[in-house]
Amino acid sequence: MLRLYVLVMGVSAFTLQPAAHTGAARSCRFRGRHYKREFRLEGEPVALRCPQVPYWLWASVSPRINLTWHKNDSARTVPGEEETRMWAQDGALWLLPALQEDSGTYVCTTRNASYCDKMSIELRVFENTDAFLPFISYPQILTLSTSGVLVCPDLSEFTRDKTDVKIQWYKDSLLLDKDNEKFLSVRGTTHLLVHDVALEDAGYYRCVLTFAHEGQQYNITRSIELRIKKKKEETIPVIISPLKTISASLGSRLTIPCKVFLGTGTPLTTMLWWTANDTHIESAYPGGRVTEGPRQEYSENNENYIEVPLIFDPVTREDLHMDFKCVVHNTLSFQTLRTTVKEASSTFSWGIVLAPLSLAFLVLGGIWMHRRCKHRTGKADGLTVLWPHHQDFQSYPK
């Protein structure tokens, strides 16, 4: 919607306004540099599209605006009157053929009676040698062991309204012939189909379109750097937690993790969530007392895990009657693991309270036993004074 609004406002800006506002056109608003830079080869055709005016918009706004081009902030417009390699057509600046000296910043200015803005676009023209491949190549990525498509980019200015597009494809300067079972150039398109992508398919590709102008043939070349990425393999996920029953005290805060083992599988395509009585947590607890925590993805010993916690803040009696499920799903499997919340036994809390009392009784009992033993020992010492007399009397008969 935002893009549509901007386009509508852009079209309305080109509508002629009353002459009373013509002073506004004297100051041009600079809208910045276009995000895309044009990297082209010397000796080939180049078409720079005015960034403010897409091709499909040109037909409707061209009668209402004046479009001019300047180079490197020069006051002189391009192309000049005597320039034969450059011309402006349908909102684009054409250079044929382009030379290295054409490199620079080109500013497109659109103006009517009440509105004026300008925007710049960068052009770099390189010598046509392999040394500049890293600078002029478009990176494209295909997945290993699959079939994919390479696209010859930025040819719309030269292929518009044409149904007989013929493109020749090269890999490392070798022409890919029609009988090649590995590579197939899709007729009438800018696509190259690559069957069963292998690691050795990586490298530089060139697509060449022949363009005719005033009876002369020109080549338009685009270079592509193909990068191969390994296919992300999926495995059957295994839920390793939570436990079947979780004990918690009413009024306490509780976190139950749902941990899933993926092995070497990718977590990107694995979904993990919680339910309560087969209902999503957000619906079962609209007040937000029980929520899902943030998803975590991590590795342990080069094996992948994902985890989503269920958070109670706090636990209430309502939770004791809920059937909670951890649910995991990917293209290979759908699994669930149930858990319930049980009120923690009160025995443990009474034990905590009674433990200090028991210890106190033991201490007091020990003190009492110590004093009693000491008292008995004192009595025993008094008796031993008499024992020698009794022993002498009994041991020696007359």
Curated annotation (Swiss-Prot):
Extracellular topological domain residue ranges: 14-343
Origin: domain of life: Eukaryota
A biological process term (GO) from this entry: protein processing
Domain Ig-like C2-type: 18-124, 134-223, 237-349
Listed Gene3D superfamilies: Immunoglobulins (2.60.40.10)
One Pfam family per UniProt: ig
Modification after translation, per record: A soluble form (sIL1R2) can also be produced by proteolytic cleavage at the cell surface (shedding) involving a metalloproteinase; hovever, several sIL1R2 forms ranging from 45 and 60 kDa are reported.
Glycosylation sites: 66, 72, 112, 219, 277
Keyword annotations: Cell membrane, Disulfide bond, Glycoprotein, Immunoglobulin domain, Membrane, Receptor, Repeat, Secreted, Signal, Transmembrane, Transmembrane helix
Cytoplasmic-side positions: 370-398
GO CC annotation terms, alphabetical: cell surface; cytoplasm; extracellular region; plasma membrane
Region feature (Contains proteolytic cleavage site): 329-343
SUPFAM superfamilies reported in the protein's UniProt record: Immunoglobulin
Extent of the signal sequence: 1-13
Disulfide-bond pairs as recorded: 28-116, 50-108, 152-207, 258-326
Transmembrane segments: 344-369
GO molecular function: interleukin-1 binding; interleukin-1 receptor activity; interleukin-1, type II, blocking receptor activity
Protein task: Non-signaling receptor for IL1A, IL1B and IL1RN. Reduces IL1B activities. Serves as a decoy receptor by competitive binding to IL1B and preventing its binding to IL1R1. Also modulates cellular response through non-signaling association with IL1RAP after binding to IL1B. IL1R2 (membrane and secreted forms) preferentially binds IL1B and poorly IL1A and IL1RN. The secreted IL1R2 recruits secreted IL1RAP with high affinity; this complex formation may be the dominant mechanism for neutralization of IL1B by secreted/soluble receptors.
Family listed: Belongs to the interleukin-1 receptor family.
Oligomeric form and interacting partners: Associates with IL1RAP to form a non-signaling interleukin-1 receptor complex.
Entry protein name: Interleukin-1 receptor type 2
Organism the protein comes from: Homo sapiens (Human)
Gene, per the UniProt record: IL1R2
